[in-house]
Each structure stands twice: as structure tokens, then as C-alpha cells.
Amino acid sequence: PIERIDQKLKAIEQTIRSYTNNNFQNRKIRSAGVVSSSKLNVINKLYGLSIGDTVQITESMFNDGLYTVKGIEENTIVLDKELIDEGHILITKVEYPDDVIECCINLCEWEVKNRGKVGIKAETLSRHSVTYFDQDASNQMNGYPVSLLGCLKPYRKARC
């Protein structure tokens, strides 16, 4: 089902953000705002923000997180999830470089093809034998082979 795919993509996105310690925010497309009637009213119009873009809300008591833009009318932004009314938030556009998106696609493909084989070291059927890559703590991160996460190395930021 589509909900399962959406959930898996969100989990992979969170894995990438956690692994790199990078929130991929475009701070040039940012504004303070308020939430009223589940709509986000920004102080400054966000030029460069479009329907379908990912945004991150921070400095919020109730609404911190990642959202998808569903609608924009002047200084009002409609997001994909209900928001709780509050007097101050900060909204910033999130932009992932193409090679990070490619890495996400590779993780999705690995998930589909190999997740069920994790923990199986070898299989033998009649005279046919297959040995799988052994995944242990030294060569995996967040459940994925380190080799798949190598493309994220340029985006890793030091933790404070």
C-alpha cells in the first residue's frame, strides 16, 4: 500500500538526516510565522517555495518537524498535516542535493531486494549454493550497509 511506501520513505529520510547530522535547510528561504486554524501565516513571503516542497518547522512548542507544502496563497501556507495553533514558529525550505536523492533511491532498492535476506549467511538448494554479504556492526549503519551510505560522506556534519 502507498501508506507503507510513504512511511518507509520518511524513515529513510530520517536515517539520512540522522547519519549526516545535516538538516539540508536552505536558510535563504526562511521566515518566522504563526499558526492559526491549522494554516501557517508567514511574516515574509517565501519566494522559491512551491507546492510539493519539503519544509521544516523549528522553534515551535507543538509543530516541530518536516512537512510537505500542499498550498500557497500570498503569506499563507497549507501543509500536509494538521498544525496546532501557536504564536511563533520558524519555517525553512529543505532541499536535498541530487546525489542524496540518488542515495535514497539506492536505499529503497536495497530495502526491497535485500531486507528479507538480512541475517541469512548462505542458502543451498540442491547443488546450487549462494553466500550472502555478512552484515554486522562493523559494516552497517542504521540497518543499511555502510557501502550504500558512502555517498553521504560529503554531507556529514560534526556533532556539537
Task: Give, region by region, the residue ranges found by the protein language model.
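Conserved short "hinge" loops at termini or chain/domain junctions
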Residues: P1-E102, R115, S138-C160
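Conserved, mostly hydrophobic/aromatic
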Residues: R127
